[in-house]
Design a protein with these regions (language model features):
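Extracytoplasmic
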Residues: 13-56, 72, 157-161
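Hydrophobic core of transmembrane alpha-helices in multi-pass small-molecule transporters
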Residues: 25-27, 95, 106-122
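Residue-level signature of mid-helix packing/kink "hotspots" within the transmembrane helices
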Residues: 34, 62-70, 155
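Intracellular juxtamembrane helix-capping segments at the cytosolic ends
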Residues: 43, 119-135
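Helix-breaking motifs and short loop linkers at transmembrane-helix boundaries and internal kinks
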Residues: 48, 80, 101-106, 136
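Helix-to-loop junctions at the C-terminal end of transmembrane segments
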Residues: 68-81
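Primarily marks hydrophobic transmembrane alpha-helices of the MFS/SLC 12-helix fold
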Residues: 82-85, 108
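C-terminal ends and interior cores of transmembrane alpha-helices
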Residues: 90-103
């Protein structure tokens, strides 16, 4: 008797999933992790805040991501992943829109915490889990490519965002 892997090869479509995941991770993690660094000097100049205060905006997003990952991973186990990721992308977009209108430090802290907790966390953990599900063998390579997107986004997003200033 043949095993499933011998009779039906894994679909090529799985590499589309890996590529799309890498792109989504690049955009979301690039924005939450390093994207805010581009706006530090404009925030210093506009509001007169101290470096530590402005840096805490980034920290609040990362803390939100760390805590939210636990909850969003669990939700992704019970909900179709595409809905969780769509929700996360929408939250990040709305939080960035809100941040463009914010004029108090606490508003930035709150918006970036929410963007991390409900946004980036709803993208990171579910996408990584989803990529792994598409591979019976070679999951390590696929996960490496997907997470490389995250690293490229963290390095490249500041340059892209600098064009907006």
């Amino acid at each position: 008797m043949n095993s499933i892997s011998e009779t039906s090869p894994e679909p090529i479509y799985r590499w589309v999933i890996v590529s799309a995941s890498a792109l989504m991770l690049a955009l979301s993690m690039g924005m939450i992790v390093n994207g805010t660094s581009v706006f530090f000097i404009p925030l210093f100049d506009e509001f007169g805040w101290q470096r530590g205060e402005v840096s805490l905006i980034n920290t609040s997003g990362l803390v939100g991501l760390a805590i939210g990952g636990i909850f969003m991973g669990r939700i992704a186990d019970k909900t179709p992943i595409h809905w969780v990721v769509l929700f996360g992308a929408t939250v990040i977009g709305l939080c960035m829109l809100g941040a463009s209108q914010a004029d108090a430090l606490w508003q930035f802290y709150l918006l970036f915490f929410i963007a991390g907790f409900l946004g980036a966390a709803a993208i990171f953990a579910p996408l990584i889990a989803n990529v792994g599900r598409w591979f019976k063998t070679g999951a390590g390579l696929a996960l490496g490519i997907a997470t490389a997107g995250q690293a490229l986004g963290q390095g490249g997003m500041p340059y892209v965002l600098a064009l907006l200033i």
